[in-house]
Every structure is written in C-alpha cells, then in structure tokens.
C-alpha cells in the first residue's frame, strides 16, 4: 500500500482503513506500507511492516529527478523483497519513480485509489493512468457530475472509505468529553483546505 503526502491525511487514512479491513478478512495476509507520510508510526504500531521515504521538499537542494530516482530504487527493493500480488497507490499524481519501479518488478494487480475523477483538461498523462489495472473512486458526501477522460482502464466506484466502522465510533457525549467541549455548546468545524496549494488567502 502506497499512500502519498497530501494537504491533510486523507490518502493515509483511506489506506490505513483499507489495511485494517483486509487484515480482518484475512489475518494471515501480509500487508506492507511504503509511504512518504510522516504518520508511518501508526501502521507500524498496528503490526504492519512500514517503509518510509520523506517527500522531496524535506531534502534541501534535491530536484525531482534525484528524488524520483530514490523512489524507484527503494520501491524496487521493497517489491523485489515482498513480491506482492497487488499494489495499491493512493494519491493525486503517480510519481515517475513509482511507475519506473512497477515497470521493473512485475506486480499482477496494480490499483490506483483516487477520490477525484480524471477531469477533462487534467494534467495527468493518460499513459500514466494506463499503467494501472483498476481505478477505484471512493464516493464523496456530495455527488459531482462526471467529466472523466477516456483512459480505457476499468473503474470501480465504492462508498466513502473511512478509518473506522460505525460500531467503533464514539457517542456524541463521549466525543465531546474527550475533546473537552461542553455537551450543550454549538460546535463548528472549519477546514480551510490546502493553504498555498489552493490560494485560500483570497477567500478568508
């Protein structure tokens, strides 16, 4: 499983939830994480072997070509060591180093877990999409009109993917108590989004 860095932890949360459910279905299934996320300690503590490579911005003076070469070398070693039957990537854009590693080590099933559709005019090359055998689109709470490019890869739409199941959720009272919020208070959650990525200054 390869969750990437995003603005928040959406990629990681989906993959972590997927790993927990797969383990529940088959306790003997080997599930390996390879991630650029700093949250690697969470799956590691849960018993999932985890490999980490920091994102390119963490390396001073390193260009994208050098970083992608590191991705290719490390991921190739991981794939060669574990020989997975399925590779699942969760991210907005596939890294060139990742695609090169998948070209080096054959993986029977390659899946791209991507929340958003590939909209017309997208900067994602169609040949990158074609590297995968299956595209999985988790649904959002709000349905969006489809305007997906014709990429020729099988698509599967699934319900929203969450980290925990309904029976694992805290009650309203317990959640407020853990957060230190008065039971009778009106609570508003504000998510400003992607910061510099979405230029939110103009909206605040």
Predicted regions and their residues:
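Conserved nucleotide-sugar phosphate-binding/catalytic loop shared by glycosyltransferases and other
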Residues: 1-7, 21-77
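Structural beta-sheet core signal
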Residues: 1, 33, 111-112, 137, ...
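Short N-terminal targeting/anchoring amphipathic segment
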Residues: 75-94
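A short helix->loop->beta-strand "cap" motif at the edges of active sites that frequently abuts
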Residues: 27-29, 105-110, 132-133, 153
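A nucleotide-sugar donor-handling region in carbohydrate enzymes
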Residues: 115-116, 121, 128-198
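Short amphipathic alpha-helix
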Residues: 11-23
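Short beta-strand elements of ligand-binding domains
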Residues: 88-90, 111-115
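A conserved mid-protein helix/loop that constitutes part of the nucleotide-sugar donor-binding site
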Residues: 13, 195-204
């Amino acid at each position: 499983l390869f969750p990437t860095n995003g603005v928040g932890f959406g990629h990681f949360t989906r993959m972590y939830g997927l790993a927990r459910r797969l383990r529940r279905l088959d306790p003997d299934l080997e599930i390996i994480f390879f991630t650029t996320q700093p949250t690697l300690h969470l799956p590691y503590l849960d018993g999932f072997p985890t490999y980490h490579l920091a994102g390119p911005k963490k390396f001073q003076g390193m260009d994208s070509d050098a970083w992608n070469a590191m991705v290719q070398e490390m991921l190739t070693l991981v794939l060669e060591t574990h020989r997975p039957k399925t590779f699942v990537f969760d991210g907005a854009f596939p890294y060139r180093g990742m695609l090169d590693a998948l070209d080096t080590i054959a993986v029977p099933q390659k899946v791209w877990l991507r929340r958003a559709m590939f909209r017309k005019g997208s900067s994602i090359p169609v040949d990158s999409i074609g590297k995968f055998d299956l595209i999985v689109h988790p649904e959002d709470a709000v349905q969006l009109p489809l305007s997906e490019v014709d990429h020729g890869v099988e698509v599967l739409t699934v319900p929203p993917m969450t980290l925990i199941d309904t029976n694992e959720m805290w009650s309203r009272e317990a959640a407020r108590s853990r957060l230190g919020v008065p039971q009778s208070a009106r609570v508003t959650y504000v998510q400003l989004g992607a910061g510099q990525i979405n230029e939110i200054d103009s909206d605040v």
